[in-house]
C-alpha cells in the first residue's frame, strides 16, 4: 500500500504522542502535553501506512497572514522515503487555502525546510503592534516564535526560518 496523508483524528493522538516522544528524547522536538495534542488535533495531519501512523505535522495559525509549521516528524524506519516532504507539502497547501502568506518554523532540520523554500531569519517577522497582540497568547509555541527569554532554554540551537507563499 501507499502512504496516505490525511487530517488527524482524536484516535491518532496516541500514535502522534509516541512519535513526538521519540524525537523529544533525542532533543529534536519540544515536548508537548497530551492534553495539548487533543486540543490541537485539528491542526495535525498524519502519514498513514497500512493502518499505522508513521508521521505527523501541524499547521498553527499565528496571525492573519502568518502560520507556523509544527511537529513534523516521521518514525525512524520510514525516514528518507520523502514522507516528511509529503507532510510538509500538505501543510503548505493547507496554509495557502487558509489565505496565509507566510509560514514560520523553528527547527534543527534546516536543509529539509530549505528544500521547500524556507529561508533563515532573525527575530519575529511581525509588525510591533502584532507582536504586542501575540504577547497576550498563552501558547508556548507563540512564546518561542516571539523569542521570549522565558523559553530560550527550550529553543537553543534551533534555527528560525520563514517561507513566503
Residue ranges of model-derived segments:
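A short, internal acetyl-CoA/4′-phosphopantetheine-binding micro-motif in the GNAT/acyltransferase core
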Residues: 72-79, 108
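C-terminal "cap" of GNAT-fold acetyltransferases
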Residues: 126-165
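Conserved acetyl-CoA-binding loop-helix of GNAT-fold acetyltransferases
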Residues: 80-93, 104-105
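Short amphipathic alpha-helix that is part of the acyltransferase structural core
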Residues: 1-31, 48, 157-165
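A conserved beta-strand-loop-helix scaffold within acyl/acetyltransferase catalytic domains
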Residues: 31-44, 49, 55-74
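Conserved active-site alpha-helix within GNAT-family acetyltransferase domains
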Residues: 97, 101, 107-135
